């Protein structure tokens, strides 16, 4: 499965459809990249805000998941996004796990253009999911 090979370790069809690539994942940090296609743009020719929110969701959740490889997913409990600039061209993202509880992860991250322009920032809380123990 494409996403598993790209570093997600789980199959997420929507993320695969977008073409998100994980560049680095481990120790609470995730770096990713999206090379947008025309169908991911808004009516002004910028990357759609929903796509940017998805990138941040993936980066923040994946950063948390990278702290515990036994978890098999993460659910978004809450996420706050600040949009700062329009995204034109490739988008680079970074997510960082800030604090890990027993089942919740608190993460932050940002998206930047290739020239380093800050596009968006986010914070979020995620519930880690684990395989059933069979009980």
Where are the model-predicted features located?
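Terminal targeting signals and extreme-terminal segments of soluble enzymes
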Residues: 1-135
């Amino acid at each position: 499965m494409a996403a598993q090979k790209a570093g997600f370790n789980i199959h997420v069809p929507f993320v695969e459809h977008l073409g998100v690539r994980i560049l680095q994942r481990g120790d609470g940090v995730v770096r990713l990249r999206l090379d947008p296609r025309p169908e991911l743009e808004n009516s002004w020719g910028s990357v759609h805000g929903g796509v940017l929110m998805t990138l941040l969701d993936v980066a923040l959740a994946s950063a948390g998941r990278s702290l515990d490889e036994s978890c098999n997913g993460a659910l978004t409990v809450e996420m706050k996004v600040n949009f700062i600039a329009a995204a034109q061209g490739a988008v680079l993202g970074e997510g960082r796990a800030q604090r890990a509880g027993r089942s919740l992860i608190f993460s932050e991250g940002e998206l930047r253009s290739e020239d380093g322009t800050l596009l968006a920032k986010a914070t979020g809380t995620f519930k880690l999911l684990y395989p059933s123990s069979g009980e």
